[in-house]
């Protein structure tokens, strides 16, 4: 059974935890007792709906959470079905690896966990450290307090993504094993769950699959977001209310009804338009200093094309590089023209 595994010696005392993290036990206990007051609210805008509630820890809690990640959480051997926010040089995890699991699928079942991070309670985190890692109750309770805010896992903290991957550590592997025995593929990227089949599925089977996932979520006090539950056959499109258009079905933003995940046509068109907009702004006199913030964001979007091996990726990348070179040369020319002639004379 493919399941999370912590293959190292358990930590039984606060002294041992102190040595592992390189911080005094007194500091760890002090921060744990007041950790809920050591965050700043950093709302993240979404394409639709209200902003996403995210939090960033203040120092020194932030650096201690980073140590908890690097020295404990990141050392877990994560099962292949988990793809979100995991550092694994031997089996790289990303939106691409997640979508690739379902390439060429005939049927896809998409499910979303409602209010995922706030649903992960401090007791769930303590159970992860106590039962999966094998740590003592004292150590597990302290680590749970250091990685939660107001009794729940705060989205945005460096440790939160790892805890989100591990919260179903004792129930998800059994579900995946049963699905694989039926010839189905399963993956989870944070709160996005995808199940796919290479053969048609009848309505009774689909109902059982939804119920099985619902039961797994309920084990940890989580619920499905009913508005994000979708069942699609190969070739079907999905109507997006925001743009009032039908678009191909995607898994973590990538089309999956081919062997290799791809970027939807509408997104490719938008990326090309963004590059053209930058070129037009440069033609009208915008400097690279003015263009750079937008250019960085556009380059990130181009990176998605390159990662999917789409030919537009390299072409658009070269256009941005050429734009940068032209803009910087033009900036130097304007600077030179603005200087008095004596500034460039040599005696």
Per-segment meaning from a language model:
Residues 1-138, 142-157, 166-169, 173, ...:
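Right-hand nucleic-acid polymerase module
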Residues 110-114, 156, 160, 182-200:
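Catalytic palm active-site di-aspartate
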């Amino acid at each position: 059974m493919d399941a999370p595994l912590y293959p190292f010696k358990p930590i039984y005392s606060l002294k041992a935890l102190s040595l592992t993290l390189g911080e005094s036990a007194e500091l760890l206990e002090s921060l744990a007792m007041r950790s809920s007051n050591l965050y700043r609210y950093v709302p993240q805008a979404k394409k639709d709906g209200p902003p996403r509630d995210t939090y960033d820890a203040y120092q020194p809690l932030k650096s201690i959470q980073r140590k908890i990640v690097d020295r404990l959480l990141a050392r877990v051997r994560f099962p292949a079905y988990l793809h979100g926010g995991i550092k694994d040089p031997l089996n790289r995890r990303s939106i691409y690896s997640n979508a690739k699991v379902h390439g060429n699928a005939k049927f896809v079942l998409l499910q979303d966990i409602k209010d995922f991070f706030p649903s992960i309670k401090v007791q769930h985190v303590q159970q992860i450290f106590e039962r999966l890692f094998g740590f003592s109750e004292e150590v597990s309770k302290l680590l749970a307090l250091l990685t939660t805010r107001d009794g729940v896992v705060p989205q945005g903290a460096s440790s939160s993504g790892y805890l989100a991957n591990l919260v179903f550590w004792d129930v998800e592997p059994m579900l995946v094993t049963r699905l694989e025995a039926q010839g189905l593929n399963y993956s989870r990227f944070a709160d996005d769950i995808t199940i796919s089949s290479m053969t048609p599925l009848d309505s009774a089977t689909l109902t059982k699959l939804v119920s099985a996932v619902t039961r797994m979520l309920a084990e940890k006090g989580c619920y499905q977001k009913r508005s994000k539950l979708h069942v699609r056959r190969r070739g079907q499109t999905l109507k997006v209310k925001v743009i009032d258009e039908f678009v191909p079905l995607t898994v973590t933003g990538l089309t999956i009804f081919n062997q290799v995940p791809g970027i939807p046509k509408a997104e490719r068109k938008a990326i090309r338009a963004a590059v053209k907009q930058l070129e037009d702004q440069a033609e009208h006199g915008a400097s690279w200093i003015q263009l750079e913030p937008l250019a960085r964001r556009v380059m990130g979007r181009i990176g998605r094309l390159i990662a999917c091996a789409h030919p537009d990726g390299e072409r658009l990348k070269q256009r941005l590089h050429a734009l940068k070179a032209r803009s910087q040369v033009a900036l130097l020319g304007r600077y030179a023209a603005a200087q008095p002639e004596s500034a460039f004379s040599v005696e």
